[in-house]
Curated annotation (Swiss-Prot):
Gene3D superfamilies reported in the protein's UniProt record: 2.40.50.100, 2.40.50.150, 3.90.1100.10, DNA-directed RNA polymerase, beta subunit, external 1 domain, DNA-directed RNA polymerase, subunit 2, domain 6, RNA polymerase alpha subunit dimerisation domain, RNA polymerase Rpb2, domain 2
Role: DNA-dependent RNA polymerase catalyzes the transcription of DNA into RNA using the four ribonucleoside triphosphates as substrates.
InterPro entries, per the entry: DNA-dir_RNA_pol_bsu_ext_1_sf, DNA-dir_RNA_pol_bsu_external_1, DNA-dir_RNA_pol_su2, DNA-dir_RNAP_su2_dom, DNA-dir_RNAP_su2_hyb_sf, RNA_pol_bsu_bac, RNA_pol_bsu_CS, RNA_pol_bsu_protrusion
EC number: 2.7.7.6
Domain of life assignment: Bacteria
Catalysed reaction equations from the record: RNA(n) + a ribonucleoside 5'-triphosphate = RNA(n+1) + diphosphate
Membership in a protein family: Belongs to the RNA polymerase beta chain family.
Coiled coil: none
Keyword terms: DNA-directed RNA polymerase, Nucleotidyltransferase, Transcription, Transferase
Taxonomic path: Bacteria, Pseudomonadati, Pseudomonadota, Gammaproteobacteria, Alteromonadales
GO molecular function: DNA binding; DNA-directed RNA polymerase activity; ribonucleoside binding
Subunit structure as annotated in this protein's UniProt entry: The RNAP catalytic core consists of 2 alpha, 1 beta, 1 beta' and 1 omega subunit. When a sigma factor is associated with the core the holoenzyme is formed, which can initiate transcription.
The protein, known as: DNA-directed RNA polymerase subunit beta
Annotated Pfam families: RNA_pol_Rpb2_1 (PF04563), RNA_pol_Rpb2_2 (PF04561), RNA_pol_Rpb2_3 (PF04565), RNA_pol_Rpb2_45 (PF10385), RNA_pol_Rpb2_6 (PF00562), RNA_pol_Rpb2_7 (PF04560)
Length: 1342
């Protein structure tokens, strides 16, 4: 493999056995592609805004005299960029402008004659835009729209599993689900009649639907039944015989062949053997007794030819009288329906009998009554309602997906068709349902991923936009119908409010629009790749059963079987598998390598769950020979959801990668294959809660996915083009782009600005640090700067800690964790949290609130950290209770006592008519002020601090832009200088002249002169561009802010809080091994090894066997080897070993084990080898990909390389006594995470606080400043101790005895420490509840 200069800095040793066939697709593509589809112009009008407009326009007036047509749309430029939107608390969006055409028709002239056409561009609200990382900024906060997994439109056949009827009979049903419109259900009842329901309302006989479609009874029977013909021959009845149709019936008479031999005896059931004998004998007609025919059903109407009278109607039951009447009417043959209890039920025939309607109108009226009970039906209303239900494009749409699924399920050739239903569709669904009822087909599996599809951002936004447009459509129609339209323009017809409201509501408060989890890069990526079955049009937690939540065979490679939340949402919220993507229809697809005649090709096909069923698919770890042929004769493979063994010639596909079945979070757990699934689930979920530490530390044992996550998450800065690093500081990186990658006529400079100390959604700190140095060569895709939780472009969620598995005085009982003081002292798990506190000054009824440092009744010391505007200084260290922003609010006039009047007369007015409502630091917080933002309403005078901040921002912007300009100008002048020197001008003369004067020189060579003119033009352009950019920025900074009504000023203060690790904090490994820190012990008390190296963390060995997460042990061993090799390299560097020796040792390390990785260290220069070795001093990072990782032998080999015992266990000594422990202990390096469950956020004590209204007991929880619950069991404990008085005060004055606690407070004030308990309020609540049951209880005084 060829490594770039940056990649050579640190190379991860990979234990993967299989080469990567397919790169992992861009992780955020599900979000970005979907939204791009929504926003981009779609010529076909199938997707996005274009589709929404085309589905609603043109809007015609009721009279048909006017029509509003859609022409095109365009999105404007957003006013603020993403960062500005976050600071100002506004939505990152672009204005939508739509070109509409109003066409007026001439009433007097011929229909369709155009009188007037007006075209105009109309503003239709703002459309939120997606940032380049797949998020939306709504009201200043980053949000993610989670994709939804919903039931695909189409037709589904199911049964009730025998739960509906007491007999336990299985009742089958069919459901036609459109993308939008009414649901259509067909279902059987216990008597085998077929019913129809529309939108889950009252059921009607299904044949009403057929009658409403104008199908006569005879035709209905013809569609659903085969016919038997009977010939009347004198007094004999000759029935046509199809031997197959007799199977299962009981012979009521002997059936003889032409020779008189008995083929079937009377009373015998006719079996397949009998039917074969009948076929062989060639019997096509049999004489049958009249009784045999009685009870059969007539297939058609029979009319007396002479009188025209109906003799027998279709679907009548055959009686002897009927047959005689037919005979008298001159009929010699008649047809009956072929009905057979076994596999040709009489369902439709029976249903027709209970159907009260006889013609189309009656059927329509019946449907109207069911849909609109209580309204009088008219013919037109009934027809309109029925047509609108399933046959109108405005009201009903199956969508292309629905039509494809519908046709495919009914076995049709084509997968395209109309979005509405037609007669054939409804009949075919009923036929298919009857086929299933007859046992000739199976019901559908609704949890199959072929029946569930993904709705992503773009599609959901389009639907919401359409909802807004439909609201507008109604208003436009009414407006078009009102009188004179000659003076009306399209602008006057459209009100953009409903559209904006629909879109805003979706992005702001829809169930699927979630506050982005921004704990660390992994949690961001996972949030964007999440798939939820909840949300509008989806399931609800309460109704979802086990089947929906369970892992389904079709999840393989599409949805991760591991990563899902614990708790009520388990299985309803899933994560996309690593290689999965959605196809055009929204179904999940996963890639497979094609196999032809047992040979694996490089061709890769993406298959959806629907297509996958018919193939036999081998796993990724199948053995191949050198030619790429399947080596074994029998191969384990998946076929139709089952795992079977098949011959190699039958195998059609194989997996792309062993990690294709798991999600991103699960694929960064090393040795995942050795962990129990439940613990792996916890491990995957807990990685998302890891807080970024002060100094990120790459995992020594990883899986090789760390780089992908770090780069795709967007937290790092990645080079867009190759070049050389020209300039680096903490906030900016400048790259001089390679000549071959620049476009003709551009400056060839790329500038990357870094994010510094910004607050994330979870209050963690986002900060980027450059990883490159000036002069280094860069390739496109190289990581230039690390973000939070990344180290040299690799994900680094935690720290590598030296751990020992051993008990230590009970301090690691029940998953507790014992850590060394060194961990805290070295700030290994110190994290920075940034809190935003805001103070709002409003205009009140009594006058405006003021932000000032003149606050009543506050001493000088409390105002020491405020400036004269009343806002805290940046850099001030504050603690709980300190004032951050001084604010006073006017208070109402109160009646003053004479003393107060006197004081006011002497000391002036001010102090008494305002109250102090300053913003103070919350009690449990202490930190440093790192930033202050002041927002002032337009028209309100800015205070001194606001002007200072404004001036500072302007200076910063000017500096940034002029730096940018200078860098670009330098590039331009460098090109001009080269050109002039080539043209023969001396360098010294150029140096002495002003640079801008160079462009005035005239050259003899025409081509050179043209090029110089071009360069001069470019210079003028970038100068003008600089002025323009600065003016735009200046206007943005100096203009007033658009604040909510009644708000005059907002001050936002940002506090940085540094949190060291402490007892009570939660920590975890990557294998679901979580625990809480019990205590921090001095370094000298910790167990140490022979060399005197103490361990950092002591874990309980009993946490491993029952949890079955052995991955942590293997990680510990491999981590020990990785660190040991690092120590060896460090020693070599310190002892200045020969380069050849160092190189050969590194070769041995990277070449160990059977691996596909090829690191050609011979191509590395000595400097590169030294730099690589320098970065490996703390340990050689290793990758053990999931399901393809390091074997036990390889781990042992690495331990040997590090000169460590193969067992991975070493002798430890007790730090307190110096004695050796009884037996060797497993010691190694494990990657530990600090989770966002910090004791500082949970610690809480109540003094006095609020009480619940009903029970009068203290509220619960930190947010409510609540008390500690003293529950039932705690009461038992005090009872057991006999602590009667303690118990009494717990149940009365400390809880809900209102009078008692008031008296006690009074007593304490008086210095009298007694309590008089009264009646607890909860007793009164109990009395009231008993009274509500109708039992009166009263307390009588003795």
């Amino acid at each position: 493999m060829v490594y770039s200069y940056s990649e050579k800095k640190r190379i991860r040793k990979d234990f993967g056995k299989r080469p990567q066939v397919l790169e992992i697709p861009y992780l955020l593509s599900i979000q970005l592609d979907s939204f791009k589809k929504f926003i981009d112009l779609d010529v076909d009008g199938q997707h996005g805004l274009e589709a929404a407009f085309r589905s609603v326009f043109p809007i015609k007036s009721y009279s048909g005299n006017a029509e509003l047509q859609y022409v095109s749309y365009r999105l404007g430029e957003p006013v603020f960029d993403v960062k500005e939107c976050q600071i100002r608390g506004v939505t990152f969006s672009a204005p939508l402008r739509v070109k509409l055409r109003l066409v007026l028709f001439d009433r007097e002239a011929a229909p369709g004659t155009v009188k007037d056409i007006k075209e105009q561009e109309v503003y239709m609200g703002e459309i939120p835009l997606m940032t380049e990382n797949g998020t939306f900024v709504i009201n200043g906060t980053e949000r993610v729209i989670v994709s939804q997994l919903h039931r695909s439109p189409g037709v589904f056949f199911d049964h009730d599993k025998g739960k509906t009827h007491s007999s336990g009979k299985v009742l089958y049903n069919a459901r036609v689900i459109p993308y939008r419109g009414s649901w259509l259900d067909f279902e059987f009842d216990p008597k085998d009649n077929l019913y129809v329901r529309i939108d889950r309302r009252r059921k009607l006989p299904a044949t009403i639907m057929l009658r409403a479609l104008e199908i006569p009874t005879e035709e209905i029977l013809g569609m659903f039944f085969e016919k038997n013909q009977v010939r009347i021959d004198g007094n004999r009845f000759m029935s046509d015989i199809v031997p197959d149709r007799l199977r299962g019936e009981t012979a009521q008479f002997d059936i003889l062949d032409s020779d008189g031999n008995v083929l079937v005896e009377a009373g015998r059931r006719i079996s397949a053997r009998h039917t074969r004998a009948l076929e062989k004998a060639g019997i096509v007609e049999l004489e049958v007794p009249a009784e045999y025919l009685v009870g059969r059903v007539f297939a058609c109407d029979y009319v007396d030819q002479e009188t025209g009278e109906l003799v027998v109607a279709a679907n009548d039951l055959l009686t002897l009288e009927n047959v005689l009447a037919l005979k008298e009417a001159g009929y010699t043959t008649f047809e009956t329906l072929y009905i057979n209890e076994l596999d040709h039920g009489a369902y439709i025939s029976d249903t027709l009998r209970i159907d009260s309607s006889t013609n189309r109108l009656e059927a329509l009226v019946e449907i109207y009554r069911m849909m609109r009970p209580g309204e009088p039906p008219t013919k037109d209303a009934a027809e309109t309602l029925f047509t609108n239900l399933f046959f109108s494009e405005d009201r009903y749409d199956l969508s292309s997906v629905g039509r494809m699924k519908f046709n495919r399920r009914l076995g049709r050739e084509t997968s395209i068709g109309a979005g509405t239903l037609d007669k054939d569709d409804i009949v075919d669904v009923m036929k298919q349902l009857i086929t299933i009822r007859d046992g000739k087909d199976d019901v559908d599996d609704i949890d199959h991923l072929g029946n569930r599809r993904i709705r992503s951002v773009g599609e959901m936004a389009e639907n919401q936009f359409r909802v807004g447009l439909v609201r507008v459509e109604r208003a436009v129609k009414e407006r078009l119908s009102l009188g004179d339209l000659d003076a009306v323009m399209p602008q006057d017809l459209i009100n953009a409010k409903p559209i904006s409201a629909a879109v805003k509501e979706f992005f702001g408060s829809s169930q699927l629009s979630q506050f982005m989890d921004q704990n660390n890069p992994l949690s961001e990526v996972t949030d964007k790749r999440r798939i939820s079955a909840l949300g509008p049009g989806g399931l609800t937690r309460e109704r979802a059963g086990f089947e929906v939540r369970d892992v389904h065979p079709t999840h393989y490679g599409r949805v991760c079987p591991i990563e899902t939340p614990e708790g009520p949402n388990i299985g309803l919220i899933n994560s996309l598998a690593s290689f999965a993507r959605t196809n055009d229809f929204g179904f999940l697809e996963t890639p497979y390598r094609k196999i032809v005649d047992g040979v694996v090709t490089d061709e890769i096909d993406y298959l959806s769950a629907i297509e996958e069923g018919q193939f036999s698919i081998a796993q990724a770890n199948v053995v191949l020979d050198e030619t790429g042929r399947l080596a074994d004769d029998l191969i384990p493979c998946r076929h139709r959801g089952e795992t079977t063994l098949k011959e190699s010639s039958e195998i059609t596909y194989m997996d792309v990668s062993p990690q294709q079945i798991v999600s991103i979070a699960a694929s960064i757990i090393p040795f995942l294959e050795h962990d129990d699934a439940n613990r792996a689930l916890m491990g995957a979920n807990m990685q998302r809660q890891a807080v970024p530490t002060l100094i990120a530390d790459k995992p020594l044992v990883g899986t090789g996915m760390e780089k992908t996550v770090a780069v795709d998450s967007g937290v790092t800065v990645v080079a867009k083009r190759g070049g050389r690093v020209d300039y680096v500081d903490a906030s900016r990186i400048v790259i001089k782009v390679n000549e071959e990658e620049t476009v003709a006529g551009e400056a060839g400079i790329d500038i990357y600005n870094l994010t510094k100390y910004t607050r994330s959604n979870q209050n963690t700190c986002i900060n980027q640090r450059p990883t490159c140095n000036v002069g280094e060569p860069i390739v496109a895709g190289d990581v230039l700067a690390d973000g939070p939780s990344t180290d040299l472009g690799e994900l680094a969620l935690g720290q590598n800690m030296r751990i020992a598995f051993m008990p230590w005085n009970g301090y690691n009982f029940e998953d507790s964790i014992l850590i060394s003081e060194r961990v805290a002292m070295e700030d290994r798990f110190t994290t920075i949290h940034i809190q935003e506190l805001s103070c709002v000054a409003r205009d009140t009824k009594l006058g405006p609130e003021e932000i000032s440092s003149d606050i009543p009744n506050v001493g000088e010391s409390a105002l020491g950290k405020l400036d004269e505007s009343g806002v805290v200084y940046i850099g001030a260290e504050v603690k709980g209770g300190d004032i951050l922003v001084g604010k006073v609010t006017p208070k109402g006039e109160t009646q003053l006592t004479p003393e107060e009047k006197l004081l006011r007369a002497i000391f002036g007015e001010k102090a008494s008519d305002v109250k102090d409502t300053s913003l103070r630091v919350p009690n449990s917080v202490r930190g440093t002020v790192i930033d202050v933002q002041v927002f002032t309403r337009d028209g309100v005078e800015k205070d001194k601090r606001a002007l200072e901040i404004e001036g500072m921002q302007l200076r910063q912007v000017k500096k940034d832009l002029s730096d940018e300009f200078n860098i670009l100008a330098d590039g331009i002048f460098a090109r001009a200088k080269n050109l002039l020197i080539k043209s023969g001008i001396e360098e010294s003369r150029l140096e002495s002249a002003q640079r801008e004067k160079w462009f005035d020189l005239t050259l003899t060579d025409e081509d050179a002169q043209t090029e110089l003119d071009q360069i001069a033009e470019q210079f003028v352009e970038i100068k003008a561009d600089f002025d323009k950019k600065f003016e735009i920025k200046r206007r943005k900074i100096t203009q007033g802010d658009d604040l909510q009504p009644g708000v005059l000023k907002i001050v936002k203060v940002y506090l940085a809080v540094k949190r060291q690790i402490q007892p009570g904090d939660k920590m975890a490994g990557r294998h679901g091994n979580k625990g809480v820190i019990s205590t921090i012990k001095p370094v000298e008390d910790m167990p140490y090894d022979v060399n005197g190296t103490p361990v950092d963390i002591v874990l309980n060995p009993l946490g491993v066997p029952s949890r079955m997460n052995i991955g942590q042990i293997l990680e510990t061993h491999l981590g020990m080897a990785a660190h040991g090799i690092g120590v060896k390299i460090d020693r070599m560097l310190k002892e200045h070993e020969e380069m050849a020796k160092l190189r050969s040792f590194l070769k041995e390390v990277y070449g160990a084990g059977t691996t596909h990785q090829e690191v050609d260290l011979d191509n590395f220069s000595d400097d590169e080898i030294t730099r690589l070795a320098d970065n490996l001093r703390k340990g050689v990072p290793m990758a053990t990909p999931v399901f393809d990782g390091a074997t036990e032998a390889e781990i042992k080999h690495m331990l040997t390389l590090a000169d460590l015992p193969e067992s991975g266990q070493i002798a430890l000594f007790d730090g307190r006594t110096g004695r050796e422990f009884e037996r060797p202990v497993t010691v190694g390096y494990m990657y530990m995470l600090k989770l966002n469950h910090l004791v500082d956020d949970k610690m809480h004590a109540r003094s006095t606080g609020s009480y619940s209204l009903v029970t009068q007991q203290p509220l619960g929880g930190k947010a409510q400043f609540g008390g500690q619950r003293f529950g039932e069991m705690e009461v038992w404990a005090l009872e057991a101790y006999g602590a009667a008085y303690t118990l009494q005060e717990m149940l009365t004055v400390k809880s809900d005895d209102v009078n008692g606690r008031t008296k006690m407070y009074k007593n304490i004030v008086d210095g009298d420490h007694r309590m008089e308990p009264g009646m607890p309020e909860s007793f009164n609540v109990l009395l009231k509840e008993i009274r509500s049951l109708g039992i009166n209880i009263e307390l009588e005084e003795q």
